[in-house]
Amino acid sequence: MNKRAAIQRAKIKMKILLSNDDGVYAQGIHALADALRDLAEIVIVAPDRNRSGASNSLTLEHPLRVSQIAENTYSVQGTPTDCVHFALNELMKDALPDLVLSGINHGANLGDDVLYSGTVAAAMEGHFLGVQSIAFSLAGTTHFASAAHFVRQLVEQHLANPIPTNRLLNVNIPDRPLELIQGIEVTRLGARHHAESMIKQKDPRGHDIYWLGPPGKEQDAGPGTDFHAIERGWVSLTPLQVDLTAHESLRSMDHWLKEKVNG
């Protein structure tokens, strides 16, 4: 079966859940939906407002309020993780989607950004709950059409030849016109320096208030990293795993514990 036939066959039953952390009205999620409507049934479940930086947080102290604002489009008073959790465990529990896609984020999620990112967290929740998931981020706020092109390319490739891993994928697209993007590279996460200092100001009543400083500059941004790909005009595709265990340290830590505590 050729690629076109495989895509046409998959379209008959394909269903995709979309979420994000920029909010249900954000430009990125609608660019994502528009790029895929003729490929699949699209369901949008996203926060009612911007929840950037929410990471994997869940709402535990009050109920989630959900509003249907259009056909197959739902606004949730909660975090990105809440949205995907609600969608897969309630809204779509009797017919789970084939893919969970998060984004298109308004700004890159590179290196250790992924630890804070609500965009990545929404995809991670889909992964936790057993659905192939991909997070998409645009390294800026202008060329959403370029990002949508690569979203569609990757989804079509998945339809014709399913992604050969059960890992979560983190995809970043340069904020450039399509003709200036070189292609797609598989990368690893880079790393930043520590974030800059807090910014102290006064509120109108003279009380001290504090803003988080901007993210740190790139520290590990050499060849093979997601930072390096984006800087050179390539789309970065990074497979992520949920297991945070430092496996290479297990033996040395076991030795240290026995030597210092038990010996």
Curated annotation (Swiss-Prot):
Subcellular location: Cytoplasm
Cofactor binding, per record: Binds 1 divalent metal cation per subunit.
Enzyme's top EC category: hydrolase
UniProt-annotated binding residues for a divalent metal cation: 21-22, 52, 105
Keyword Nucleotide-binding: yes
Gene3D superfamilies membership: Survival protein SurE-like phosphatase/nucleotidase
One Gene Ontology MF term: nucleotide binding
EC number: 3.1.3.5
A Pfam family this chain is assigned to: SurE
Any one GO cellular component localisation term in the record: cytoplasm
Cofactor(s) listed: a divalent metal cation
UniProt KW keywords: Cytoplasm, Hydrolase, Metal-binding, Nucleotide-binding
Major location category of this protein: cytoplasm
Annotated catalysed reactions: a ribonucleoside 5'-phosphate + H2O = a ribonucleoside + phosphate
Top-level taxon of the source organism: Bacteria
Purpose: Nucleotidase that shows phosphatase activity on nucleoside 5'-monophosphates.
Entry similarity comment: Belongs to the SurE nucleotidase family.
Protein name (database record): 5'-nucleotidase SurE
Species: Vibrio cholerae serotype O1 (strain ATCC 39541 / Classical Ogawa 395 / O395)
